Swiss-Prot record:
Residues 212-222 have a biased composition (Basic and acidic residues). Binds the lower part of the 30S subunit head. Binds mRNA in the 70S ribosome, positioning it for translation. This is Small ribosomal subunit protein uS3. GO terms for molecular function: mRNA binding; rRNA binding; structural constituent of ribosome.
């Protein structure tokens, strides 16, 4: 099951929080979902080169707050915050409501699965070899402190006539372990041969509650002592 479903959705309420945080009623449920989709689609298209790793939408009775977590927040803020003001006005025109925008910096950009997937996609669009792009992202994640990373690319790799899937795995990525903190990202590279899908899973460690023991692996298991030979009578 862990191999098939989205690892973020599988862990909601366990070690992952929702990215849309509000309580709906029957009257505004569809409207709120549509607004969240428009906000995310607009920001990802408008601020693609700022390296957005996460967009949080929070609603209260009268307020709508959007938090953008980006690797390069200076691109969004601009000189003296002028770009943020323009962005706020564009969002207000889009959904017809007052919006507060907060910009946060992604301190560990190398350990963000979404940024890693977008990095591979950008390199593929620049005609860099897919194996080289995958290995570069893996090295960056390991330097950022990731305990494991898996990168998968699917499509007409290298211009081949038949589409295929290639993937690399470094370290551990336990998709079936619900207490494992796993980040997931997806991006598409639009090449002359067609679209290439990029998926990235990054394992950041286990979230242990009181009384829980970490999962033992083959590397961490203690070595068995050699048996003593019995002496003859």
């Amino acid at each position: 099951m862990g191999q098939k479903v989205n690892p973020i959705g599988l862990r909601l309420g366990i070690n992952r929080n929702w990215e849309s945080r509000w309580f709906p009623t029957k009257a505004n449920l569809v409207e709120n979902i549509g607004e969240d989709y428009k906000i995310r689609a607009f920001l990802k298209r408008k601020l693609y080169y700022a390296g957005i790793s996460q967009i949080l939408v929070e609603r209260t009775a009268k307020k709508l707050r959007v938090t953008v977590v980006a690797a390069r927040p200076g691109i969004i803020i601009g000189k003296k915050g002028s770009d943020v003001d323009n962005l706020r006005k564009e969002l207000q025109d889009l959904i017809g409501k007052d919006v507060n925008i907060n910009i946060k910096e992604e301190r560990k950009a190398g350990a963000s699965a979404q940024l890693a997937a977008e990095s591979v996609a950008t390199q593929l669009e620049k005609r860099i070899a897919f194996r080289r792009a995958m290995k570069k992202v893996i090295q960056g994640a390991q330097k950022a402190g990731a305990k494991g990373i898996k990168v998968s690319v699917s499509g007409r790799l290298g211009g081949a006539e038949m589409a295929r899937t290639e993937w690399y795995l470094e370290g551990r990525v336990p998709l079936h372990t619900l207490r494992a903190k796993i980040d997931y990202g997806f991006a598409e590279a639009r090449t002359t041969y067609g679209n290439i899908g990029v998926k990235v899973w990054i394992f950041k460690g286990e979230v242990l509650h009181k009384g829980m023991q970490p999962e033992k692996t083959e590397e961490s298991a203690p070595a068995k002592k050699p048996r003593r030979t019995r002496r003859g009578k």
